[in-house]
């Protein structure tokens, strides 16, 4: 992750599930779920190379936010039409669509450069539609990614990991409370 240029930006990324019967297409609320399905990757980290900038379409006068980022190698292949949701800095959640995806090397695990834009903030209708069309939810774990492990965790695994983290903190606190000697400022061997 440290070898890929850009600033870290945590997003909830909706990657299109493409098969022989469905092609790459932008998200449309009017399309049924069987014709457009997604895999949600929560807490995914994009490496921003061009920060979000306000731009205006001269013909329509409509404002849009545009930017560019890198997708780290070994994660997934981004497609034009993928969408993601993330904070845009003013407390609002932006609804972004990938407008360009380019593989940057011939290697199997390559960095992908993406460009994205938005013309609106997320809305309850968009969230509801994306939720209906989501067939798989994964969590991105940057620690697993850094150590070359499978970077995705399923929802049930994430719940177990959260419980283990909480249990570890409770155990650590109890251990120090029971075996720490205040007088000598050290741990006493049990």
Predicted regions and their residues:
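Interface-prone segments of viral and bacterial extracellular assemblies
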Residues: 1-190
